[in-house]
């Protein structure tokens, strides 16, 4: 193909190496096909905004204690492992920089009445409970608020789950490079 031959010419003469932002296995595969030599930033929070993943994330956010969070995180772990496996496989040994969960938790919950009612129905709780939780998660300045390492310090089980997903796959890859 024309794109393929252009890439071969580029690879022969360029010194520039491009790393991309990729948050899904599909993004990583597309980036690799366009010549990316790694992922400069994989934002794990972008992995959670669809289907069953968002439900499990919301369950974790609504959990009242560490045990409840661990139960929800046990549902999230296989999703994380599958996403990381796909990303690592697509990158075929190229470097991947992973950022652990960073955004404020309020980004994972609906702010409109219809979405909150759907969440309440799905979770088996009252609309008022959801509204109270959503309000309690809002911050005046979320860019400096409860996110990143502060979130990890408050809820270390989140960091533990993500670390388990990443390192578990890394260990598999080291021992059996073709298994990923």
Task: Pin down the residues of each PLM region.
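Conserved alpha/beta-domain cores
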Residues: 10-171, 175
